[in-house]
Design a protein with these regions (language model features):
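The beta1-alpha1 cofactor-binding region of Rossmann-like NAD(H)/NADP(H)-dependent oxidoreductases
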Residues: 41-42, 62-74
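Active-site helix of classical SDR
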Residues: 119, 155, 163
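Substrate-binding pocket helix/loop in short-chain dehydrogenase/reductase
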Residues: 95-108
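Residue(s) in the substrate-gating loop at a strand-loop-helix junction
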Residues: 139
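Active-site loop-to-helix junction immediately N-terminal to the catalytic Tyr of the SDR YXXXK motif
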Residues: 104, 145-153, 165
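Conserved glycine-rich cofactor-binding loop
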Residues: 9, 16-18
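Alpha-helical segment proximal to the catalytic Tyr-Lys
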Residues: 124, 168-169
Length: 185
């Protein structure tokens, strides 16, 4: 496609499978250096091997993004491995949590706060690189009724609102902020 991404640094959380892996694959195919994280070490290693076939730098590290300290350490290591950070793709998912206190809290920690914390840490690095983008992976469930998992839809709606505010707040620093909202896959 020739998107002029050769040598750009891209972090994709939740990048070992599904949408996250597809996003990381797209960036790697365009020559970007990519860092991914996930909880499952077997899926993470398989994704690392797959992404490495494109010839770019690939950094992969196990991380539970709901753990603020673990996320901070991962993002620091990823920035160091990539040398620069131009794009952060926040793609964590806690889909399928129960409609109880524990399910709600886990959804908040994974689907909202991991993206908020990741953005806080990434924004100065992206600005230092001359600007770039933060992309939040939301869901159609954040835009319309979702009866299967109430916490998931509500938290994705909150992420959509955060994205709007963050886009305005970071524009003057050369950082575009968008959310994508895939439907059922």
């Amino acid at each position: 496609m020739q998107l002029k991404l050769k040598g750009k640094g891209v972090i994709v959380t939740g990048g070992s499978r599904g949408i996250g892996l597809s996003i990381a694959e797209g960036f790697a195919a365009e020559g970007a250096n990519v860092s991914i994280c996930a909880r499952d070490p077997i899926a993470l290693e398989a994704a690392r091997v797959q992404l490495s076939a494109h010839g770019s730098i690939v950094h992969a590290e196990r991380c539970d993004v709901s753990d603020a300290n673990a996320l901070e350490l991962y993002l620091s290591a990823a920035c160091e491995a990539l040398g620069t950070l131009n794009v952060l793709v926040n793609n964590p998912s806690g889909f399928g949590r129960g409609d109880d206190e524990e399910g709600w809290q886990k959804s908040i920690d994974v689907d909202l706060m991991a993206s908020v914390r990741g953005s806080w840490q990434a924004a100065p690095q992206i600005e230092k690189a001359g600007g770039g983008a933060i992309i939040h992976v939301s869901s159609i469930s954040g835009l319309t009724h979702s009866q299967r998992t109430p916490p998931y839809g509500a938290i994705k709606a909150a992420l959509n609102q955060y994205t709007k505010t963050q886009a305005i707040d970071l524009a003057s620093r050369g950082i575009r902020v968008n959310a994508i909202a895939p439907g059922s896959i």
